[in-house]
Amino acid sequence: MTTSSPLLAAKIGARARELGCEALDAPVSGGDVGARDAKLTIMAGGPETAFKLAEPLFAAMGKEWKLQGPWGAGQHTKMANQIAIASNMMGVCEALAYARAAGLDPRRVPKASPAARRAA
């Protein structure tokens, strides 16, 4: 349940299969608040049999969990999520820089902008 390399996840999954074990890669989104409140989003990769076995654990930790594909797919999904988050953060930074350059108080702009409030 960590964010790591999709290649490493596939290697761990293959080794688990050799040993007769089940394995998933299952990175999460939601941070420490999501973990504390059992509201994590869990992005899993691996066999459906392993996913079904892990669902009671996921239900105790999260609000949403999806099997994304084979081993490594959870890691790839987490990376895609991080790209989306980073681009939103960059957009907010650009908007505030623009506001400042236009002579506005950048602390006031998010209060009047629904898009900035959602992203912040």
Residue ranges, per PLM feature:
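Rossmann-fold dinucleotide-binding core
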Residues: 3-82
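Helical "substrate-binding/catalytic lid" subdomain
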Residues: 73-120
